[in-house]
Amino acid sequence: MNIPMRDPVIPGTSMAYHPFLPHRAPDFAMSAVLGHQPPFFPALALPPNGAAALSLPGALAKPIMDQLVGAAETAIPFSSLGQQAAAHLRPLKTLEPEEEVEDDPKVHLEAKELWEQFHKRGTEMVITKSGRRMFPPFKVRCTGLDKKAKYILLMDIVAADDCRYKFHNSRWMVAGKADPEMPKRMYIHPDSPATGEQWMSKVVTFHKLKLTNNISDKHGFTILNSMHKYQPRFHIVRANDILKLPYSTFRTYVFPETEFIAVTAYQNDKITQLKIDNNPFAKGFRDTGNGRREKRKQLTLQSMRVYDERQKKENPTSDESSNEQTAFKCFAQSSCPAVPAVGTSSFKDLCPGEVDRDXDSXDDXXLEXSEWGKISTTTXTHPWXQPAXGRQRVTTXGTKGAAVPKATSSPXTR
């Protein structure tokens, strides 16, 4: 049974959301909410001096709206933000009065049982320089929204504590104090804003959110530190316009079972197996666990054996030639398979082994293709094939017309 979880960020609180009090907020920039988010709101980013003025100590440990109220209470002078930031300030009185809306949002985590399985073993999420999607993906279902009101749905990932971890003796343990925080970003669902009726009619999924350890990332990915524990948070904002975010009602929901440790490669074999068993893109690692290349090689050898047997039945007089050339072709194809893997771009979002080498995978495919090209062009003129072709010409009394069909019927020249 899915039930909404309360936010454990504030000890002792019994509320699952944190409403914003608009009458306490004077004018301030939208960047107080979103921080550094050039991929999502390039025009709303503050200059360096403005960003520094709005940074609050310990802000990441507070709910979103506590950060907003804290920024408002600092009473930052309008002129200190510079001309660029001042251009994006909107007085509260210029906003349209919000219509009376009655709602009682409740959020249910999808695939709760799967998340709990991972949580019991210590969930790990791989982070890479090029960005990696989460598995299980973060999906929720919302109820209790006003059907006509518009909402913006957001997600962010914050540090769960101030510790660094290591995997030792088959368990996670504290290894020291946490590294300095990475720049924080909020991921706004691409369908925002939408009416409550639209949100409630479907599962809200954040499967496109990507995790990275590249501090210079410019794609809007969530930047995390490896070997640190993190907690995803989900936010519901009632607003018809993104520019009204600072003055809108925020509700924050936290599901403890979605907590995870960021890693560059999976540490716990049990987590690796869970991901293989439940991720639809992990078919190549099931059963034997040998990976795609080994499976391709086995399929190639099996198909060549069938082909060889069929050729023996059709051409009994050229058994010797077929055996020699087929043996070489089997060896060439098994060592250099040329069949590309299906679904490689999607599959690399999961597995820690060969797919973690994002740049190497493309090079490997090109290398396989080039090597196979060389082998296939030399097979027809390989020294093993030449004596057999010579013997065939002798048995046909030297007639050119008979020698050509014999050569073209061998597996090496097809």
From Swiss-Prot:
| Keywords noted in UniProt | Developmental protein, DNA-binding, Nucleus, Repressor, Transcription, Transcription regulation
The annotated region (Disordered) lies at: 359-414
Kindly indicate which segments of the sequence are annotated as binding DNA: 114-287
List the Pfam families hit by this protein, alphabetically.
T-box (PF00907), TBX2-3_TAD (PF12598)
Record bears the keyword Transcription regulation? yes
One GO MF term on file is: RNA polymerase II cis-regulatory region sequence-specific DNA binding
Q: What job does the chain carry out? A: Transcriptional repressor involved in developmental processes. Binds to the palindromic T site 5'-TTCACACCTAGGTGTGAA-3' DNA sequence, or a half-site, which are present in the regulatory region of several genes. Probably plays a role in limb pattern formation.
Q: What is this protein called?
A: T-box transcription factor TBX3
Name of encoding gene:
TBX3
